[in-house]
From Swiss-Prot:
Pfam families: P-loop_SecA (PF21090), SecA_DEAD (PF07517), SecA_PP_bind (PF01043), SecA_SW (PF07516). This is Protein translocase subunit SecA 2. One of its GO terms (cellular component) is cell envelope Sec protein transport complex. The keyword Repeat does not apply. It comes from Pediococcus pentosaceus (strain ATCC 25745 / CCUG 21536 / LMG 10740 / 183-1w). The lineage of its organism: Bacteria, Bacillati, Bacillota, Bacilli, Lactobacillales. One of its GO terms (molecular function) is protein-exporting ATPase activity. It is an enzyme of class 7 (translocase). It is a peripheral membrane protein. GO terms for biological process: intracellular protein transmembrane transport; protein import; protein targeting; protein transport by the Sec complex. PANTHER family: CHLOROPLAST PROTEIN-TRANSPORTING ATPASE, SECA INNER MEMBRANE COMPONENT OF SEC PROTEIN SECRETION SYSTEM. Belongs to the SecA family.
Length: 789
């Protein structure tokens, strides 16, 4: 008999679940005060050394009863099992409508007993606020503190106070950006986040997989605007696909071929296009290539009022105010011939993978994770366990219906929607892009079918539309998986008509995303149906199927013209379905590989980031940095002495610009240029004299320490911002080199290490410069204002 680890784990967790349920009757007899005092009792046990595991059964039984008394809802056995699974650091796959929100109360309460640092993370600000308000009542009733970490009306929140709560409901981006901004403060007391103890991620596949390649980036420090975007755009538009450049299998990456590079060198009249000399120009060519051939209008972005607006890949919503980093946004603007926006530097960056790996404990919930179980385990060490449903799932999932062309598919889709509309059966119709949702909407209107279109809505309005999508006669057109996290409840009389009909108009790049769509129907034992109507010219097929499929499709079209095949007839047999399935598998594999590369690249940045952030904290906590500053000066003057040996002009220029503005070279003895030690000694003497002048203004040890801390911190931040920005630019370039000739991760690591060494020198230089050349302005009350050069 084969051993099944998942079943073993579920049996283990089921035993714990039964013990929790067994306490149910006992806890029902407790008065409110007796139940609420349990929080203090459990906390006292933790103080005395008890583990969370040892108090889990009692804690879960307590909060389960509290859920009923405050919300009128008592978690079912499957929800309690899901909650146990979550506590032990797993992903719980729970179908739509199985009550993930209530399930989360148990692990959050248990971990909340330890104090601040526990988070329910979602992608949706509206849901985070809603659940913090509604579900938060339970925690507060039980004596814990709970708050929302997001604002819906741009109200300024006191994040430091919010993160002192035992439990915080927030979004992945809000939490990640707060972590990054914490590492830009100049005083340790200004940090908002103190502890990253437990993160329970709702829709975990969306956060940790679908959004994994999009790093959180804080931008600032404007760059000097480049004039190369327009010229490189024109050059790239003249190149030939598959000759001068070629695509990855999923068409999501593109790079120049050797032929293309040679053509460009000949056209530009240069040699060594990919050498350091032409690196900036080459980077702009790469950006123009991506903008023109990878980024698609009305799929990745829209142009409105002569402005490029990004689109949310999850729901098609326009992301006002957000821009792509590393110059790609400006390259798209050049492509679309609109005014170029200001280009900014990346000041801080982290991917969601590496951010959530920082938590002591991580778990997640979703309706669709099993198909990505291997990736969850390999990348996050998160096993995926499927939780049984409370009621049997009776949804009917039909096999795909495949058509030769999109036109045939659209007509069949409209016929199916019309048939459901006539009997007032609700339909959820999912499209793959904003432009396609508009197309289907227009066709439905032409047939007199009243419907809602779910794209670019506010999150609150989106939730309302989704919630009503199960009502009699409701037809809802949605882009991708808009409205996740909101249940579709069936209206009166809908069960008798077969429940919600879910129609997918194309296969997405991942089977998991299609499973999410199917999961919208058949909640909590309700009837429902799902079906995908697909065609051989759908995006996933065009981008991932072999070349012969296009010839096969053209042959089918010709058969219609010759009267050998009936127009609109679905393709019979498994061959057509296999084409679509294999194309989707290829897309899914390519996306997984791309995510793995993104993890590897960010791991390289993570090592540097952790070193810098730990060093930053050390600087802010230190009361005396004199020894460190002296060591920095020593290392830097050593390097300068070696670099400027036998070059009086460069040495004197360095002194005036970095050590003493007022330096006079009357006493300069050219003989010192023969010895590195003599140059270093000479630099140290000038630095001592200059520091003596500064000490006359900062005339006590406290002020000197303050200046040292400010100078070192400022120098570190300037150097690190330069490094982060360099690595963002570097990532763009190395991922666009032909994969046959280069390993992008290896190239990135090699160049990132070299860049880090350059960053250290910049840090040394600026520390010395800020210490010696800052203008110190005494105040009337004995204070000193520092103005850095």
């Amino acid at each position: 008999m084969e051993f099944n680890l998942d079943n073993f784990r579920l049996r283990k967790y089921s035993k714990i679940t039964k013990k929790i349920l067994a306490l149910g009757k006992k806890y029902q007899t407790l008065t409110d005060d007796q139940l609420r005092i349990k929080t203090e009792t459990l906390r006292n046990k933790l103080v005395k050394g008890a583990s969370l595991d040892s108090i889990l059964i009692e804690a879960y039984a307590t909060i389960r009863e509290a859920d009923f008394r405050v919300l009128g809802l008592k978690p079912f056995e499957n929800q309690v099992l899901g909650a146990v699974v979550l506590h032990y650091g797993n992903v719980a796959q729970m179908n739509t409508g199985e009550g993930k929100t209530l399930t989360a109360t148990m692990p959050l309460y248990l971990n909340g007993l330890t104090g601040p640092g526990n988070f329910l993370v979602t992608v949706n600000s509206y849901l985070a606020n809603r659940d913090a308000e509604e579900i938060g009542k339970v925690y507060k009733w039980m004596g814990l503190t709970c708050a929302s970490g997001v604002s819906l009306d741009d109200e300024e929140l006191d994040k430091k106070a919010i993160y002192q709560n035992d439990i915080v409901y927030t979004t992945n981006s809000e939490l990640g950006f707060d972590y990054l901004t914490d590492n830009l403060v100049d005083n340790i007391n200004k940090k908002k986040l103190n502890d990253l103890n437990f993160a329970l991620v709702d829709e975990v596949d969306s956060v940790l997989l679908d959004l994994a390649q999009t790093p959180l980036v804080i931008s600032g420090a404007p760059r000097v605007q480049s004039n190369l975007f327009v010229s490189t755009d024109r050059i790239v538009k003249s190149l030939k696909p598959n000759v001068d450049f070629e695509f990855s299998e999923d068409l999501k990456d593109v790079w120049f071929t050797q032929t293309g590079i040679e053509q460009l060198e000949e056209y530009l009249g240069i040699q060594g296009l990919i050498s350091d000399k032409w690196s900036d120009f080459y980077r702009h060519l790469v950006l123009a290539l991506k903008a023109n051939y990878v980024m698609k209008r009305n799929q990745d972005y829209i142009v409105t009022n002569r402005e490029v607006l990004l689109l949310d890949s999850e729901n098609g919503r326009a992301l006002t105010g957000m821009k792509l980093e590393a110059g790609i946004h400006q390259a798209i603007e050049a492509k679309e011939e609109v005014e170029l926006s200001d280009q900014t530097r990346s000041m801080a960056s982290i991917t969601l993978q590496n951010f959530f790996k920082m938590f002591r404990k991580l778990s997640g919930m979703t309706g669709t994770a099993k198909s990505s179980a291997r990736e969850f385990l390999e990348v996050y060490n998160l096993p995926v366990l499927k939780i049984p449903t409370h009621k049997p799932n009776i949804r009917i999932d039909h096999a795909d219906v495949v058509f030769a062309t999109m036109d045939e598919k659209i007509e069949a889709t409209v016929r199916m929607v019309k048939a459901a509309y006539q009997i007032k059966r609700p339909v959820l119709l999912k499209t793959g892009s904003l432009s396609l949702s508009r197309l289907y909407s227009r066709v439905l209107l032409e047939h007199g079918i009243v419907h809602n279109v779910l794209n670019a809505q506010s999150e609150s309005k989106e939730a309302m539309i989704v919630a009503s999508a199960g009502k009699s006669g409701a037809i809802t057109v949605a882009t991708s998986m808009a409205g996740r996290g909101t249940d579709i409840k069936l209206g009166k009389g809908v069960k008798e008509k077969g429940g919600l009909l879910v129609i997918g108009t194309e296969r997405m790049d991942s089977r998991r995303v299609d499973d999410q769509l199917r999961g919208r129907a058949g909640r909590q034992g309700d009837p429902g149906e799902s079906i995908f109507l697909v065609s051989l010219d759908d995006k996933v097929v065009i981008e991932n199927a072999p070349d012969w499929v296009e010839k096969y499709r053209l042959k089918l079209e010709q058969a219609v013209e010759q009267g050998k095949r009936k127009y609109g007839a679905p393709l019979k047999g498994r061959r057509a379905r296999k084409i679509v399935e294999k194309a989707q598998q290829a897309a899914d594999s390519a996306a997984e590989e791309s995510r793995k590369n993104a993890v590897k690249m960010d791991d390289i940045l993570r090592i540097q980031r952790e070193l810098i952030y730990d060093f930053r904290d050390y600087i802010m906590k230190s009361t005396d940095l004199t020894t460190m500053v002296q060591q920095i000066k020593n290392d830097y003057f050593n390097a300068i002495a070696r670099e400027n040996k036998k070059d009086a002009g460069k040495l004197l220029d360095f002194i005036i610009n970095n050590v003493d503005y007022n330096y006079m070279d009357n006493d300069f003895n050219p003989e010192i240029l023969e010895s590195t030690a003599d140059i270093k000694q000479y630099l140290e003497e000038i630095a001592r004299n200059r520091w003596s002048q500064q000490q006359m203004i900062v005339n006590n040890k406290f002020k000197q320490n303050y200046l040292e801390r400010l100078a070192v911190l400022k120098a570190l931040d300037v150097a690190w911002i330069e490094q982060v920005d360099n690595l963002q630019q570097l990532k763009t370039v190395v991922t666009s080199r032909s994969s046959g000739q280069h390993n992008p991760v290896f190239e990135y690591e090699k160049e990132a290490m070299h860049s880090f060494e350059q960053m250290k020198k910049l840090f040394w230089k600026n520390t010395v410069k800020y210490m010696l050349l800052s203008e110190l302005i005494p105040g009337k009350n004995g204070s000193v204002r520092v103005e850095f050069p």
